[in-house]
Amino acid sequence: MKPTLAFALLALGVAAPALAQSAGDWTVGVGFGLVSPKDDNGLLAGAATTIDENTRPTLTVEYFPWDNIGVELLAATPFKHTATIAGVGTATTKHLPPTLSLVYHIPTAGKLTPFVGAGINYTAFFSEKSALGVVKMDDSVGLAVKAGVDFALSDKGALRTEVRWMDIDTDVSLGGAAIGTAEIDPIVVGVSYVMKF
């Protein structure tokens, strides 16, 4: 292979799109998240409880104080879930799960940039409804971890896929009386388009 051709191919490889993150950068991601609670959600009113999954639009904003290390805030439109208490009845609730994470984006020379992160989730429950009576679910604070990968479409945009786990437990009352703790602890699968500014 002629040296000039070799250098040309090398230059093309180096110039391949990559979503590199430098100190001072911002990214915004818009997509969808599937919140899938774990299978066993604990006992409410002494009966086994299951909580269904739900998908909603999501938004992430991330600032990079250092190269490849960002502080990310996850937001979403309200998720809605139905809790089924075996032999007793059902209740529905909406929630917002804002999550603040410290994220390390692993630098690579290609289009794929994996990342891992950890932080704190705050889940606010509201609009609880049930034919059984007045239901109240307490807000939750817990650990959140994440991992995923960005596929660069250009030097300013990427397609992101990620998986999160969140520690979400809520004390539940019915008619003012405590009936137990719902252990939600969901896996959250997300797909989004990320833009760098």
Predicted regions and their residues:
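Extracellular loop and loop/strand-boundary signature of outer-membrane beta-barrel proteins
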Residues: 44-48, 84-91, 130-136, 175-181
